[in-house]
UniProtKB/Swiss-Prot annotation:
Changing residue 351 to F: No effect on phosphorylation or ubiquitination. This is Sprouty-related, EVH1 domain-containing protein 2. SMART domains: WH1 (SM00461). The modification Phosphotyrosine is found at residues 228, 231. Keywords: Cell membrane, Cytoplasm, Cytoplasmic vesicle, Disease variant, Membrane, Phosphoprotein, Ubl conjugation. PANTHER family: SPROUTY-RELATED, EVH1 DOMAIN-CONTAINING PROTEIN 2, SPROUTY-RELATED, EVH1 DOMAIN-CONTAINING PROTEIN FAMILY MEMBER. The keyword Ribosomal protein does not apply. One of its GO terms (cellular component) is plasma membrane. Residues 5-122 form the WH1 domain. The lineage of its organism: Eukaryota, Metazoa, Chordata, Craniata, Vertebrata.
Length: 418
């Protein structure tokens, strides 16, 4: 790297909160980078300096408290990505190792999909804007893979920044030597390429007696999701569309100078069900002047009440929340099966005898024949079952457990976040 890089917020395909970890080969462990602290880590698209229209992807991490860039790693085709556990992932490029400790399994899954999508685009050679992640049905977690922005910035300040030109993706490095300025600071114009189209102006259609409303012809939406904390703000949408929407979106604005406030007069009847009070002087037939309250949204009536799960951070419907819907939720039946069958013996053996240098090992009962230690692992498990015969009960018990999950009798349930 020969210059400071500050990727444009609009260039991120995924951005989450995590602690950047570094590998210490001497002790064989992972330690927080630069003293630790929560960082905003994302996968962003960057342009090659040759100006040939080709793009690459950069994993960029910036610590929140002091804006220090603690991680910069270019995504390459030979990147080896490992999911050690639901909240800790690490990868290796050119004998350099990087790790992230996420705040939730949902953030970890989102970041994993972002890295895999970047690698697929590099392999296919298609890293244009059409290949960024906008297909919610393909990727899941529909509140993550969209245009991301920093949650600390003012959402009312809309700005357009061109794509930043940085060095070619030839190395990965932890940044240690400088602190970035404020997000809204201007940058020298000679380091940028103007490749974003100007927003298309709206067509103004005025009517004298209608309220102001916006009719959106293109139903595709862009939701801002910047990380773990934004689930509190996810349902909040702006009244007007973002001017930075792509040029394919068409809008028609119906506006007028002043929106009138409607008052409704209802005659008061003693036998009615309004129950809004009586005339202070006791006279009947008084007029009640009120503004009718808005009913619940049509979506809430049709789909039921939706909340975010405290375990997996996914949205769920309270009416459809049954056992087996949340894989990250604690399940007493699954825990009991592992304790009764003494599976901790198998885990201990695999950890000490068949784990990789990172301490990761394959699931004891995995049937993946591509594993180079497939036969050795099963022979060791069979030998261990003679010392702990109760391990033989694990497979039939797990089969019964899966049947119970299919019947919604077992498994974890979503729990609404407070």
């Amino acid at each position: 790297m020969t210059e400071e890089t500050h990727p444009d917020d609009d260039s991120y395909i995924v951005r989450v909160k995590a602690v950047v970890m570094t590998r210490d080969d001497s002790s064989g462990g992972w330690f927080p980078q630069e003293g630790g602290g929560i960082s905003r880590v994302g996968v962003c698209k960057v342009m090659h300096p040759e100006g040939n229209g080709r793009s690459g992807f950069l994993i960029h991490g910036e610590r929140q408290k002091d804006k220090l860039v603690v991680l910069e790693c270019y995504v390459r085709k030979d990147l080896v990505y490992t999911k050690a556990n639901p909240t800790f992932h690490h990868w290796k490029v050119d004998n350099r190792k990087f790790g992230l400790t996420f705040q939730s399994p949902a953030d970890a899954r989102a970041f994993d999909r972002g890295v895999r999508k970047a690698i697929e685009d590099l392999i296919e050679g298609s890293t244009t804007s059409s290949s960024t992640i906008h297909n919610e049905a393909e990727l899941g977690d529909d509140d993550v893979f969209t245009t991301a922005t920093d949650s600390s910035s003012n959402s009312s300040q809309k700005r357009e920044q061109p794509t930043r030109t940085i060095s070619s993706p030839t190395s990965c490095e932890h940044r240690r030597i400088y602190t970035l300025g404020h997000l809204h600071d201007s940058y020298p114009t000679d380091h940028y390429h103007l490749d974003q189209p100007m927003p298309r102006p709206y067509r103004q259609v005025s009517f004298p007696d209608d309220d102001e409303e916006i009719v959106r012809i293109n139903p595709r939406e862009k939701i801002w999701m910047t990380g773990y904390e934004d689930y509190r703000h996810a349902p909040v949408r702006g009244k007007y569309p973002d001017p930075s929407e792509d040029a394919d979106s068409s809008y028609v604005r119906f506006a007028k100078g002043e929106v009138p406030k409607h008052d409704y007069n209802y005659p008061y009847v003693d036998s009615s069900d309004f129950g809004l009070g009586e005339d202070p002087k006791g006279r009947g037939g008084s007029v009640i002047k009120t503004q009718p309250s808005r009913g619940k949204s049509r979506r809430r009536k049709e789909d039921g009440e939706r909340s975010r799960c405290v375990y997996c951070r996914d949205m769920f419907n309270h009416e459809e929340n049954r056992r087996g819907h949340c894989q990250d939720a604690p399940d007493s039946v699954r825990t009991c099966i592992r304790r009764v069958s003494c599976m901790w013996c198998a885990d201990s053996m695999l950890y000490h005898c068949m784990s990789d240098p990172e301490g990761d090992y394959t699931d004891p009962c995995s049937c993946d024949t591509s594993d180079e230690k497939f036969c050795l692992r099963w022979m060791a498990l069979i030998a261990l079952s003679f010392l702990a015969p109760c391990m033989c009960c694990y497979l039939p018990l797990r089969a019964c457990y899966h049947c119970g999950v299919m019947c919604r009798c077992c498994g974890g349930k979503h729990k609404a976040a407070a």
